[in-house]
Curated annotation (Swiss-Prot):
Protein name per Swiss-Prot or TrEMBL: Aldo-keto reductase family 1 member C1
Native organism taxonomy: Eukaryota, Metazoa, Chordata, Craniata, Vertebrata
Effect in UniProt of substituting residue 222 to S: Marked decrease in k(cat)/K(m) value for progesterone; 10-fold decrease for progesterone reduction; 3-fold decrease for 20alpha-OHProg oxidation. 10-fold decrease in K(m) value for NADPH
UniProt-annotated binding residues for NADP(+): 20-24, 50, 166-167, 190, 216-222, 270-280
Biological processes annotated in GO: bile acid and bile salt transport; bile acid metabolic process; cellular response to jasmonic acid stimulus; cholesterol homeostasis; daunorubicin metabolic process; digestion; doxorubicin metabolic process; epithelial cell differentiation
């Protein structure tokens, strides 16, 4: 297999490419950009494409995948596509219809991976963040173990090859793993992870349970207000990363991506810029020494860019625990 498509074996026997293309973009970015960027990513060598119902771009991303299949660039089985169940569909009876809606938007028969996007539940309906007349979020109370059972049924039905979670803390992972009658373990936990927030404890826990950690915001470049504090430090301007980039004749982004691969983390690189999309697949062309890895480990300062504190309050809010 070409180094560009290096994969990790998941606990269910399926394989996931270790470098993924993240398709999220702020609301003001035209959706047509998701179509163009996803096509460029596949042309550049990305085979793992990450999206979600929340991103409101699955129609465009699906079209990009299907157009690259139609022109002979790739086969469907070459592409590893991830979608995610949003918080307004946690009730067990809403899980399969939510996935079927994503598949209809994508015009695909199955997804390779379906994740519970975030562990806090909100009231069902069309609104992704439903609020009352005072602007308060309308939360829902759902047993995530029941949600997980409904996700397992999607795997049994062949609608998702693999299933996992995102933004879960250790306690929430243990709740699923210790569930009586568990049929399938989550294959992965997709979380924010980068040199300023390296998730060492959660990574060690996931490895001990044969769960892959997938890193989003791996470049810390998602600085969209009001989600991210504009005063938070800019990761890609870090002097250590910049010095290593200079030494290896690479970009600071590539250093941050390579760091994750060498510690056994699957990494998502999100960019709509053609040059950077092409650059990011160079992550397989060089290696960091153990000293360089240690230096990057030393940058950790527990800076979580995406606190999602609008969801704080309910007991399932994941980021109050240490990890």
């Amino acid at each position: 297999m070409d180094s560009k498509y290096q994969c990790v074996k998941l606990n269910d026997g399926h394989f996931m490419p270790v470098l993924g293309f993240g398709t999220y973009a702020p609301a003001e970015v035209p959706k047509s950009k998701a179509l163009e960027a996803t096509k460029l990513a596949i042309e550049a060598g990305f085979r793992h494409i990450d999206s979600a119902h929340l991103y409101n771009n699955e129609e465009q991303v699906g079209l990009a995948i299907r157009s690259k299949i139609a022109d002979g660039s790739v086969k469907r089985e070459d592409i590893f596509y991830t979608s995610k169940l949003w918080c307004n569909s946690h009730r067990p009876e809403l899980v399969r219809p939510a996935l079927e809606r994503s598949l209809k938007n994508l015009q695909l028969d199955y997804v390779d991976l379906y994740l519970i996007h975030f562990p806090v539940s909100v009231k069902p309906g069309e609104e992704v963040i439903p609020k009352d007349e005072n602007g308060k979020i309308l939360f829902d109370t759902v047993d995530l173990c029941a949600t997980w059972e409904a996700v397992e049924k999607c795997k049994d039905a062949g609608l998702a090859k693999s299933i996992g979670v995102s933004n879960f803390n250790r306690r929430q992972l243990e709740m699923i793993l210790n569930k009586p009658g568990l049929k399938y373990k989550p294959v992965c936990n997709q979380v924010e992870c980068h040199p300023y927030f390296n998730q060492r404890k959660l990574l060690d826990f996931c490895k001990s349970k044969d769960i892959v950690l997938v890193a989003y915001s791996a470049l810390g470049s998602h600085r969209e207000e009001p989600w991210v504090d504009p005063n938070s430090p800019v990761l890609l301007e870090d002097p250590v990363l910049c010095a290593l980039a200079k030494k290896h004749k690479r970009t600071p982004a590539l250093i941050a991506l390579r760091y994750q691969l060498q510690r056994g983390v699957v990494v998502l690189a999100k960019s709509y810029n053609e040059q950077r999309i092409r650059q990011n697949v160079q992550v397989f062309e060089f290696q960091l020494t153990s000293e360089e890895m240690k230096a990057i480990d030393g940058l950790n300062r527990n800076v979580r860019y995406l606190t999602l504190d609008i969801f704080a309050g309910p007991p399932n809010y994941p980021f109050s625990d240490e990890y």
